[in-house]
Amino acid sequence: MSRQPILDIKGLRTVFRTRAREIVAVNDVDIVVNPGETVALVGESGSGKSVTSLSIMRLLARKVGFIDAGSIILRGKSGQTVDLAAIDEEAMRRIRGNDIGMVFQEPMTSLNPVYTIGDQIGEPLRVHRGTSRREALEAVVELLDRVGIPDARRRAGQYPHELSGGMRQRATIAMALICNPTLLIADEPTTALDVTIQAQILDLMQKLQSESGMGMLFVTHNLGVVAEIAQRVVVMYAGRIVESGPVKEVFRNPRHPYTMGLLRSMPRLGDATEMKRRGEKLNTIPGMVPGLANLPSGCAFAPRCSFAVEACHAAVPPLASVNEHHGSRCIRWQEIAA
């Protein structure tokens, strides 16, 4: 399998225009996804994860959000590369749903309630390949069976409200994969599901990835999911990458205070019961993610950081190399090993 990246983002900067000013939502972001690899994009709400994924898909609100700088190089099924940040909407339409598939967080809002499941999943085949409705239906039934939906032919004729939450999410995964994309973007695909169904969906996505060799960008705030599904992790805060590297290394040896805080905030099996018995509280990161319109000077995390010194407020730190594969945007990364 070629190790040339499927996705290579460099210097991505995404801006939203308001009446008063322009707000930078994603700033100087670099991400690489290789064939067969899952890269997790993590952070609290408001960190810029979803805006990054919407920038890749070019689904930003028109006239409000736009890519201001950087490149998004995609290697499609043909093996040719294209800069998604530079092409027009007509060219992007040929890529969206064909070379790139996307699974959204809430299937009930990403599925159209007035069309059958079969019609919606089959639409990319009809649009991108000119497949007949009958041929598309057969492909849909086969894929629904692969993603674990029983009685697939009958389900293809049903509407979204007739399926359970887990089945709807399986259907959206099928819709994203129907054209065999080289890249799958999954934006919080298990958040709205219970723990049992979540585990099934994660297993399914890993199985389908191993069969196809596609790359996956997995957007989540759940570090437990990251440990299970991803090989590399990119941690975002206030629109910037603050740490990135192999999952095992970053989790065992985080070198940014924000990553350390996220890991310490993870509840572990038995923690809640034992802490309640002792009258203790779960660990949290003090403060809130700052609004992008009013970012603090210097390091955006400094007001919440117990390691902050005066220099942290003076300038935005560069993304320093901990080693060849691990980076941290902290001037004190050498001092804060967990």
Swiss-Prot record:
CDD domains: ABC_NikE_OppD_transporters (cd03257)
The enzyme's E.C. designation: 7.4.2.-
SMART domains: AAA
UniProt topology in membrane: Peripheral membrane protein
Compartmental location: Cell inner membrane
TM segment ranges: none
List of residues binding ATP: G43, E44, S45, G46, S47, G48, K49, S50
The keyword Transport is assigned to this record: yes
InterPro entries: AAA+_ATPase (IPR003593), ABC_Ni/Peptide_Import (IPR050388), ABC_transporter-like_ATP-bd (IPR003439), ABC_transporter-like_CS (IPR017871), Oligopep_ABC_C (IPR013563), P-loop_NTPase (IPR027417)
GO cellular component: plasma membrane
Pfam families linked to this entry: ABC_tran (PF00005), oligo_HPY (PF08352)
Binding partners and assembly: The complex is composed of two ATP-binding proteins (BOV_A0347 and BOV_A0348), two transmembrane proteins (BOV_A0350 and BOV_A0351) and a solute-binding protein (BOV_A0352).
Record-linked NCBIfam families: oligo_HPY (TIGR01727)
Name under which the protein is recorded: Putative peptide import ATP-binding protein BOV_A0348
Organism: Brucella ovis (strain ATCC 25840 / 63/290 / NCTC 10512)
